[in-house]
Amino acid sequence: MKAEGLSGGYGDSRLINNVSLTVEKGEFLGILGPNGSGKTTLLHLLTGTLPAKKGRVYLAGKLLADYKPKELAQIMAVLPQKMDQAFTFTVEETVAFGRYPFQTGLFRQQTEKGEAIVQEAMEQTGVADFAQKPIRELSGGEQQRVYLAQALAQQPRILFLDEPTNFLDLAYQKDLLDLIKRLTRESGLAAVSVFHDLNTASLYCDGLMFMKNGTAGPKQKPEYAVTEQSIKAVYDTDVTALVHQSSPKPMIVIQPEKDSVKRQSIPFEALLQAGRDDILLQTEIPLRTLSSTPIGAGFSWSRTLIHKRLPDQPDPIEGLTACLSESGFQLQETCAMASSERLDRFVYRTYEDGELSVFICVQTGFSIWILINGYAADQFFIKALMAAEAERTKVLGDGGGTGDILIAATQTQQSENIEQRLNQLIKKGTAECIKEAAELFE
């Protein structure tokens, strides 16, 4: 499909201004934008349900306006946001309407091939089990799946969808989009869909196009389209871009309004509890953490930091998990490490620079906790972990300390030159505490 200089709207209004785009065979294009930006209106112009005031749309190399309705229905299908069902047709009868453009003769009877296509479409969308049920008795999500089956029964070359997952629960959202993605990949189906959910569109679409005030930006791969700057420009709100764990597609999270009440620094030293078998620190507010610990590894948010003494086990993670669960700790908000040696010998200090403070604790095996009263960006966490490892190696030599390293921050008190100041505190404090711990452990 190709659209050139498309403009139009309802009545005398022009809601869409000079939009051009192309959709190739096998491509999944997502159209995004705030409410009232013109997404659905553009879809109506692309499908011909709303005549364009200016511009042209080509489908399979032919002007959209030159297609007869039946001819167009054989290559294009549309799944709107919601369809009102005025008649009590069964699910199978509703899906079978998708074969209407292919029926011939006076009585337009269904062929064996058509019946097989209808059955396949129902199975693909998970509605075959209630094929004889009246569609009006189904939930909104079930009806949406029936209408998708109807669209697939047309065996279109291009499929248009307007917020197709609106009435679906998470499992069926995934099933529907997995199916569409699979059809684009295996059957060459072209798909154009309006989305509200940025992350869903980023995960499934090959290209994204943002709209604002009736104009459209360029079509781009999600990796280039979904950035903090572009989202702020389109939606006029602050967001944070994240990296998906199993896909190169970027994810976006919104930023809630910050608490206007200034939080007090956490007295890490006062909260530290230690004995022969564990070192424990718990806070009321969650800490942003980066660690190499068996439980809570990588980036997470934790209220409980614990170093537990456990005998050597075949599966250390399983043993530590069982021990913590039996003790009533919430694993989803816990960073935990384990050692087989006694834990009541350790070194800790607090280092301060104005409103910033860093609590450093060096424990058995030269495990290191670095707890920051202040804000740290994700990249600084990584730098801090590397700096701690470098200082440990400098003092002890290669292989001198193999314990886990944990970095945590309250994520409050953003200050000028914060990274430089924190880095100085961490390097100085880590070196001093490791040297003192080395003497203690001897």
Swiss-Prot record:
Record domain ABC transporter: where: 1-238
Alphabetized GO MF terms: ATP binding; ATP hydrolysis activity
Keyword Amino-acid biosynthesis: no
Binding site for ATP: 33-40
Keywords (A to Z) from UniProt: ATP-binding, Nucleotide-binding, Translocase, Transport
Family per similarity comment: Belongs to the ABC transporter superfamily.
PANTHER family: HEMIN IMPORT ATP-BINDING PROTEIN HMUV (PTHR42794:SF1)
Name assigned to this protein: Uncharacterized ABC transporter ATP-binding protein YvrA
Organism classification: Bacteria, Bacillati, Bacillota, Bacilli, Bacillales
Gene name of this polypeptide: yvrA
